[in-house]
Amino acid sequence: KALRRGGVGHTQWLKEGDPRKELYDSARAFPLTGNEQVRTGRGRFRVHWSRELAGMMHELALSGSAELNWLTTWQPYCSRVLDPMLGWDPGVERTVIWYDPVTNERRLTGKLAEIMSRVRFERRQEEPLPIVWIDDEECYSTSKTQIESLEPAAPVLMVRPDERIGISRRQWRLICDFLDDSSGFPSVSLDEEGTVRDHAAHVGL
């Protein structure tokens, strides 16, 4: 209902004390200015996104400040659907192949396995790179504990956004600070937006 009435920055219709008023405040969230319907092998889906945030993420990849990898259940549709929609260059962003979209093998375990594999890879490097993992479903304290057990050679930042608004402005500032200098961060840290809600089950595409 909040999205139908304009989403972020359009909260005048909400009563004082309604938690959605703070959640969808433009001081907390990026306005979801992108709104398109996309076709996939699983049907049509309405996608809302922040052009501002997508542009800043792409710029980090273009400048070489970050390696930007898709780790999503949208895996089969990243390069031919999501990248063009967001204005991203598939030659710059990479899609991680982490589950079988036909059999769904590894769908419930593959994301964490890929992150842990990357942590092990960085441990073998002379100049290990820090890792940022953003996921609204799988960045939990239990995952944090498993990653910590690997004793990462460079800091790992786990970010769990509220799925209703995506990465918040505060979380984006944290990510940028981490990318600028991760030396002051713990071995593994988990940031959860204060408004997140627990899912009854794995959602995804």
Regions found by a protein language model. Give the residues of each.
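Alpha-helical substrate-recognition element adjacent to the catalytic core
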Residues: 1-103
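C-terminal cap/substrate-recognition subdomain and adjoining C-terminal extension
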Residues: 64, 77-205
